[in-house]
């Protein structure tokens, strides 16, 4: 089994967040930028060798963070991202092609998911590390789903068998590269890496995630993430003193 590399697509602007003078991955969360939390959660794992972060060409915020060299004693490499998530991930994979081994695997993670727990990452690597088509964290859909008809309910949708995809999403480096390249060549627009592998005749494995692994999309999510991180820190302190 090869090494694991973190890939963080972070070239987006995140306009839905509203307010502030910076993209949501650079907003402060408990005194630190959101992307800093995301990197630390991945690079703190002993099996993760380093990270590649894909940034906008004119990103004015990254250099001020001082993350270009190391996080948790591991290298952080920077590449220029693209207009879409898939373009940024492909750029990061191309960079890894020059420094990684053919059997290495990648953990593609949203820059705005700062609350990934060590237990989740362990579970993803343990259950999905050997999967030929990769694996992803996901949670079963719990709420009743409605399909809209204008501003009214058009139908109730069965949630049986439905899961909500999260990140990280874990794949063999070569498998994901081939899937993304093929999707691009065919003009298929994919919204996450698992969809590219699905389209490329694969079946990524679902690994149960946690509700706390939330994605920062709106201002209220920052407050919720702060509560999750505070609770995680308290739990760790209790374990250390037990």
Curated annotation (Swiss-Prot):
Membrane-traversing stretches: none
InterPro entries membership: IspD, IspD/TarI, IspD/TarI_cytidylyltransf_bact, ISPD_synthase_CS, Nucleotide-diphossugar_trans
GO terms, biological process: isopentenyl diphosphate biosynthetic process, methylerythritol 4-phosphate pathway
HAMAP family the UniProt entry points to: IspD
PANTHER family: 2-C-METHYL-D-ERYTHRITOL 4-PHOSPHATE CYTIDYLYLTRANSFERASE, CHLOROPLASTIC
Species assigned in the record: Halorhodospira halophila (strain DSM 244 / SL1)
Protein name: 2-C-methyl-D-erythritol 4-phosphate cytidylyltransferase
Pathway assignment: Isoprenoid biosynthesis; isopentenyl diphosphate biosynthesis via DXP pathway; isopentenyl diphosphate from 1-deoxy-D-xylulose 5-phosphate: step 2/6
Database matches in Pfam families: IspD
Residues the UniProt record annotates as site (Transition state stabilizer): 16, 24
Site-annotated residues for Positions MEP for the nucleophilic attack: 159, 215
Top enzyme category: transferase
GO molecular function annotations of the record: 2-C-methyl-D-erythritol 4-phosphate cytidylyltransferase activity
Reactions that this protein is recorded to catalyse: 2-C-methyl-D-erythritol 4-phosphate + CTP + H(+) = 4-CDP-2-C-methyl-D-erythritol + diphosphate
The EC number(s) this enzyme carries: 2.7.7.60
Function: Catalyzes the formation of 4-diphosphocytidyl-2-C-methyl-D-erythritol from CTP and 2-C-methyl-D-erythritol 4-phosphate (MEP).
Similarity-based family: Belongs to the IspD/TarI cytidylyltransferase family. IspD subfamily.
Record's keyword terms, sorted: Isoprene biosynthesis, Nucleotidyltransferase, Transferase
